[in-house]
């Protein structure tokens, strides 16, 4: 079976010390899993690069799109292989460039040579010079431009053979999924929390989600929107378990017994307590939120301190110092933005106070909570959870 070759490069994995073989093994399995839909696809590490071979009838763009979304992959290049003979390399390079001319209508190029195998007699600059000369001879429409070429042709000579490629298509980088424990994301239907989940997954963390709703004040459509967001994320991280909690009984107790301006913060503290219990039951190491410092009243520095005081588990906030515009750009990049802006309500908009407290005092909030049976409310909420497994 004829197969096309792709060179996959890792990012931070290459910088690991004694643990590098573990990270490489996990990344290899992730790439193999991404390509498992193609019968005959194979991948293996050779001298710090991953060589992927996929049946030639599979479109190049399709293979690349599956590889670049694997966390830990820094870049991917479609490539061709040649024997370690300079004339053979030059012939393959010329053939490669003829195809590039046909598809991209380029006029100028340069060759970058790399001699990773030091036993190869010809040094890197001379590889570039000789291969460039052979390409010029075979491709009359081309000229050399070493400063601003339309195309850079890379020739990498290694122990296993010589490899010729053009583009390095960027991947997300980061660390392979599952190499950094598991976290629980508090998932709303907004823009921020899906981006926060993505960013933690990119750092190698497996993700579960908890979603709070206030049915019947919030609709089934609102929950389906969240499920669609999680399904989009599952395209990057595999099946995601989502825990669904009806927060309405707690909200009604807060509205009935506590000051109006504290409603949002009190609800947030209950969310954190419930999320921590769910995280502990499911062996999650930390909570994750999409909070961004100062964005809304519940995300001021004072409010975050009061919110965090009810849990012992670490709380990760990967967006905390990002501008909203940058968060929105990332949401567009990962495909969640258009879903997030659908105009369906979520539990945070139910019983929203007109003037929420922005600089809360912990002692005052705790006094307000003393009017509530916090332990029972949390226990009932956790016991009423529904679990939805969302696949890509």
Predicted regions and their residues:
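General small-molecule cofactor/ligand-binding pocket signal
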Residues: 145, 243-245, 316
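RNA-binding accessory domains that recognize and position tRNA/RNA substrates
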Residues: 1-184, 194-240, 309, 357-362, ...
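Conserved G/P- and acidic residue-centered "switch" motifs that form tight phosphate/ATP-binding loops
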Residues: 190
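A conserved beta-strand->alpha-helix junction
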Residues: 230-256, 346
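Small/polar glycine-rich anion-binding or flexible loop at a beta-alpha turn
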Residues: 295, 343-351
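A short alpha-helix-loop-beta-strand transition element characteristic
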Residues: 335-343
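Active-site adenylate/phosphate-handling loop in enzymes that bind or generate adenylated species
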Residues: 130-135, 168-180, 251-334, 377-389
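Generic beta-strand/beta-sheet core signal
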Residues: 167, 210-212, 245-248, 289-290, ...
């Amino acid at each position: 079976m004829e197969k096309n070759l792709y060179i996959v490069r890792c990012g931070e994995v290459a910088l690991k010390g004694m643990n590098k073989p573990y990270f490489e093994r996990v990344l290899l399995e992730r790439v193999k899993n991404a390509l498992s839909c193609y019968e005959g696809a194979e991948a293996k590490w050779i001298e710090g690069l991953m060589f992927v071979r996929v049946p030639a009838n599979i479109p190049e763009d399709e293979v690349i799109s599956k590889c670049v979304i694997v966390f830990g992959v820094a870049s991917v290049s479609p490539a061709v292989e040649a024997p370690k003979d300079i004339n053979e390399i030059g012939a393959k390079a010329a053939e490669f460039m003829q195809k590039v001319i046909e598809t991209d209508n380029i006029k100028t190029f340069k060759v970058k040579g790399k001699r990773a195998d030091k036993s190869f007699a010809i040094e890197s600059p001379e590889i570039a010079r000789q291969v460039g000369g052979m390409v010029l001879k075979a491709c009359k429409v081309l000229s050399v431009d070493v400063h601003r070429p339309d195309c850079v042709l890379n020739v990498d000579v290694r122990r296993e053979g010589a490899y010729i490629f053009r583009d390095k298509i960027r991947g997300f980088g980061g660390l392979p999924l599952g190499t950094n424990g598991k976290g629980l994301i508090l998932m709303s239907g907004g823009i921020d929390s899906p981006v926060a989940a993505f960013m933690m997954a990119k750092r190698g963390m497996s993700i579960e989600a908890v979603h709070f709703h206030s049915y019947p004040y919030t609709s089934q459509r609102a929950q389906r929107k969240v499920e669609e967001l999680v399904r989009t994320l599952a395209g990057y991280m595999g099946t995601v378990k989502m825990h669904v909690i009806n927060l309405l009984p707690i909200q009604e107790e807060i509205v009935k017994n506590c000051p109006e301006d504290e409603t949002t913060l009190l609800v947030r503290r209950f969310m954190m307590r419930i999320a921590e219990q769910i995280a502990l039951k499911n062996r999650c190491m930390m909570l994750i939120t999409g909070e961004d410092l100062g964005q809304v009243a519940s995300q001021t520095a004072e409010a975050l301190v009061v919110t965090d005081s009810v849990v012992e588990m670490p709380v990760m906030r990967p967006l905390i110092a990002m501008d909203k515009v940058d968060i929105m750009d990332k949401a567009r990049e990962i495909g969640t933005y258009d879903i997030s802006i659908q105009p369906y309500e979520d539990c945070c908009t139910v019983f929203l106070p007109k003037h929420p407290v922005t600089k809360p005092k912990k002692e005052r909030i705790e006094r307000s909570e003393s009017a509530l049976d916090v332990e029972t409310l949390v226990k009932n909420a956790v016991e009423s959870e529904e679990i939805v497994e969302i696949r890509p």
